[in-house]
């Protein structure tokens, strides 16, 4: 019965935790800072930022991202783009673009993964602050000012991660991911911030202190998700990571089931790889914030495999002719589904209220997707089942290369 209670109440507990954490974070830490009151005249003596753009087969998007960074008002900046052995014409597009624009270009012949590309690019960085961007990202003009301001206020920061938004919302998958980033990912980052440690920066858009990256050994070339891996290394070296919701960027998301599935399996595998690698170092830190973060990861994996075992047991022992058994099972399923959906609608409403501060949404068009957080748990379970065995088989010391990304329908 205790196991059944865990199966039923763990997702409900986590959703409530995210709701309460998001509300508290918003009113205590987020709302007092009005994003419309950024006075750029106060930032005349700004710190320089080196923008790193690592790309692989990004011929359709890289020019937009370069144009976005070049057009930023931020006065002290340099741009370093790294082509990681692309098999398409990405390099040719960059060389052609460079004829009329000033930036550094590192053209690697062999694809050895994003982490290796970033490690090569940072060697060319002149400034102490390094902004890492994906090659499909368009940045809000105010974002670098907000992020550099956070570093000035807190010398313990090793990284400030921004608030990614979705560019391609024309498809149902695009709309669903818009909901996910607002009602789940945004809520998780706010709640984890209150606990004192964020599980991962957003690899698509984060500002690092270069000296902090040097201390932790930069990015790990053998980890499938370099952003999660470097986040935990920063925590273990006593650096803090801040979530800056005012720093906006717009990115492209997968718009095919296959592309989305590959992305989520990779994310989950990366989280599991880090958990396996950093379990004992985390235990030795005796830091409550990291214990909470690690417990959340372990509990989620445990929940998935208990669900799998429980469902398998039910299938093996079920008697389809036993009316009482079927009625009981259906009533429990109905109760848990109704409760979870009700809580997730609350979570969606809270997230929509908070998120409207940064991006106006078509509420009528999105309300019917408020059921998605419930489906999120089902998708997460399937992804974990696929990803955890992959993490166990990680090859240490190699290169975690990347494949051509699914960028969906580019909307200019």
UniProtKB/Swiss-Prot annotation:
Main function: N-acetylglucosaminyltransferase that catalyzes the polymerization of single monomer units of UDP-N-acetylglucosamine to produce the linear homomer poly-beta-1,6-N-acetyl-D-glucosamine (PNAG, also referred to as PIA), a biofilm adhesin polysaccharide. Requires IcaD for full activity.
EC numbers, comma separated: 2.4.1.-
GO biological process: cell adhesion involved in biofilm formation
InterPro entries, sorted: Glyco_trans_2-like, Nucleotide-diphossugar_trans, PGA_PgaC/IcaA
Annotated organism of origin: Staphylococcus epidermidis (strain ATCC 35984 / DSM 28319 / BCRC 17069 / CCUG 31568 / BM 3577 / RP62A)
Signal peptide residue numbers: none
Places the protein is found: Cell membrane
Transmembrane segments: 7-28, 298-320, 332-354, 364-386
Enzyme class: transferase
Keywords for this protein: Cell membrane, Glycosyltransferase, Membrane, Transferase, Transmembrane, Transmembrane helix
Highest taxon, organism lineage: Bacteria
Null mutant phenotype: Complete loss of the intercellular adhesion phenotype.
UniProt name for this protein: Poly-beta-1,6-N-acetyl-D-glucosamine synthase
């Amino acid at each position: 019965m205790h196991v059944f209670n865990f199966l039923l109440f763990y997702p409900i507990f986590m959703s409530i935790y995210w709701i309460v954490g998001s509300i508290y974070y918003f009113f205590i830490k987020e709302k007092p800072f009005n994003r419309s009151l950024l006075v750029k005249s106060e930032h005349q003596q700004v710190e320089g930022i080196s923008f790193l753009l690592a790309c692989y087969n990004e011929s359709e998007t890289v020019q937009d991202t370069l144009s976005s960074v070049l057009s930023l008002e931020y006065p002290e900046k340099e741009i370093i783009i790294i082509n990681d052995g692309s098999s398409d014409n990405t390099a040719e597009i960059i060389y052609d673009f460079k004829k009329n624009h000033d930036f550094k270009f590192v053209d690697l012949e062999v694809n050895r993964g994003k982490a290796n590309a970033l490690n090569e690019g940072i060697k060319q960085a002149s400034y102490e602050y390094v902004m890492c961007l994906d090659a499909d990202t368009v940045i809000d003009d105010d974002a670098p000012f907000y992020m550099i301001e956070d570093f000035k206020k807190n010398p313990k920061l090793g990284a400030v991660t921004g608030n990614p938004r979705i560019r391609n919302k024309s498809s149902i998958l695009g709309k669903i991911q818009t909901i996910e980033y607002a009602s789940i990912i945004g809520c998780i980052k706010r709640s984890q911030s209150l606990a004192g440690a964020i599980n991962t920066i957003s690899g698509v858009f984060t500002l690092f202190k270069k000296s902090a990256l040097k201390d932790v050994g930069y990015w790990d070339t053998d980890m499938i998700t370099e952003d999660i891996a470097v986040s935990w290394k920063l925590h273990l070296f006593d650096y803090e990571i801040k979530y800056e919701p005012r720093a906006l960027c717009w990115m492209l998301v997968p718009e095919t089931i296959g592309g989305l599935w590959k992305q989520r399996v990779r994310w989950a595998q990366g989280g599991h790889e880090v958990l396996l690698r950093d379990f004992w170092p985390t235990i030795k830190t005796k830091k409550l914030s990291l214990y909470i973060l690690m417990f959340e990861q372990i509990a989620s994996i445990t929940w998935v495999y208990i669900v799998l075992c429980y469902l398998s047991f039910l299938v093996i022992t079920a008697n389809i002719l036993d009316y009482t058994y079927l009625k009981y099972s259906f009533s429990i399923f109905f109760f848990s589904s109704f409760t979870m959906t009700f809580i997730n609608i609350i979570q969606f409403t809270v997230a929509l209220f908070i998120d409207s501060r940064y991006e106006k949404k078509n509420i009528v068009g999105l309300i019917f997707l408020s059921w998605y957080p419930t489906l999120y748990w089902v998708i997460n379970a399937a992804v974990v089942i696929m990803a955890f065995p992959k993490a166990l088989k990680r090859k240490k010391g190699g290169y975690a290369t990347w494949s051509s990304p699914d960028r969906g329908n580019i909307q200019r």
